[in-house]
Amino acid sequence: MEDEEEEQTALVCDNGSGLVKAGFAGDDAPRAVFPSIVGRPRHQGVMVGMGQKDSYVGDEAQSKRGILTLKYPIEHGIITNWDDMEKIWHHTFYNELRVAPEEHPVLLTEAPLNPKANREKMTQIMFETFNVPAMYVAIQAVLSLYASGRTTGIVLDSGDGVSHNVPIYEGYALPHAIMRLDLAGRDLTDYLMKILTERGYSFVTTAEREIVRDIKEKLCYVALDFEQEMATAASSSSLEKSYELPDGQVITIGNERFRCPETMFQPSFIGMESSGVHETTYNSIMKCDIDIRKDLYANNVLSGGTTMYPGIADRMQKEITALAPSTMKIKIIAPPERKYSVWIGGSILASLSTFQQMWITKQEYDESGPSIVHRKCF
C-alpha cells in the first residue's frame, strides 16, 4: 500500500494475553503478530558499551530470553501492568506497523467483563500518551462472531490467558449470560510442563516454557473419547510422537498429547473446581432467553488459539449434543483462521462506513474525559 492510501486508515490492535495481533483495517490478516512479553536483563551488562537496553519487547525479548526475565503485562485477558503495556503499544505502532499513532484512529479489543477502570485507562493512554485522533474499544468475542459472518451465535473464545463463552444476539453481547473460565493456553502449557516432568524431562525456566508451548502447538490434540484414547495409548505406541529440543535431544511424547488439552473439558486435571468448556457453553445458553437458544445452539463459533487443537470441534459437538435437548440442531463452527478471528472482525468493523460515527474522537475525549468510553463502546 502507498503512504497516501494509508493516511487515516484505522489501526486494529488485538491485545491478547499471549500474542499481540496488529495491522490495518481492511486487511484480511494482521501485519504484526508477536508475543505480549516485556523482558528485562537478569544481570548487569557484561558487554560494556554494547548498548544494552533496559527492556525488550515481543520477538526480540523472545530471542534473548536466555538472559532476560520475561513478564506478560496481560493476565487472564486483563491488563495488569500499564507501564509494560505502554511499551508494547509503543513497539506495535513504531517498530512493527511503523506508523504515527497521531495520524490514525485506533480500534482496541478487550476481554468480556473487563473492569470499567481498565477501559478508561486504555482510553486515557491512547489519547494522552499516543495522541490518537480517535479510538474505540470492542469486545473480543463479538469481533470473532462478525468475522464468521454472523450477528447471532455463541462464541467460545479461548486464548492464552482466559476463556469465555459469550452469547450474542443481533450484534449485542448478553452480559448476564457470559461465562468466564480462567483456564486457557498458558495453563495448558504449564500442565504439559508438569506431566512431561513426570516422564523425566525437566522444564523449569521461562525460556523452557516457550519450548513446551511449541510442543503443545505442534503435537497436542483433543481426543473424541478420552478413556478409549488412554487405553489405546497404554496398549500400543501408535500415538507416540517425537520432538527435537533446541539442543538436539529428542523427547518422546505419548498420552500427554491429548491429556494436556483434555483439561479444557476436565479442569479437575489441574485442580480447578470449574466446569469444562462444554458445560460452560451449555450453562451460558441456558442463561439466555428460551426463544433465542435454538439460534445459539446452531451457531457455536470457536475462536482463539486454544481452539486450534485438532479434534476439538468434533468433541464439542459430541459433548453439547449430550447436554442439549435431543431434537436440537447443534452446529460447531471452527473457521480455519480462528486464531486471528478477533483481529479479522476488528478489521471488518473498523472499515464499515456505518461504523465511522462510532469512533470516540479526541474532541469528545477532551470534553468528557475517559468515562466517555462507557457511553460509546458497548
UniProtKB/Swiss-Prot annotation:
Q: Which UniProt keywords apply?
A: ATP-binding, Cytoplasm, Cytoskeleton, Hydrolase, Muscle protein, Nucleotide-binding
Q: Does the keyword Lyase apply?
A: no
- What reaction(s) does this enzyme catalyze? ATP + H2O = ADP + phosphate + H(+)
Q: Name one Pfam family in it.
A: Actin
Task: Please indicate which superkingdom the organism of origin belongs to.
Answer: Eukaryota
Principal localization? Answer: cytoplasm
Q: Which InterPro entries match?
A: Actin, Actin/actin-like_CS, Actin_CS, ATPase_NBD
What EC designation does it have? 3.6.4.-
SMART domains in UniProt: ACTIN
| Similarity section | Belongs to the actin family.
> What is the documented function of this protein?
Actins are highly conserved proteins that are involved in various types of cell motility and are ubiquitously expressed in all eukaryotic cells. Multiple isoforms are involved in various cellular functions such as cytoskeleton structure, cell mobility, chromosome movement and muscle contraction.
This protein's name: Actin, muscle-type
Organism source for this protein? Molgula oculata (Sea squirt)
Please spell out the taxonomic lineage of the organism that makes this protein: Eukaryota, Metazoa, Chordata, Tunicata, Ascidiacea
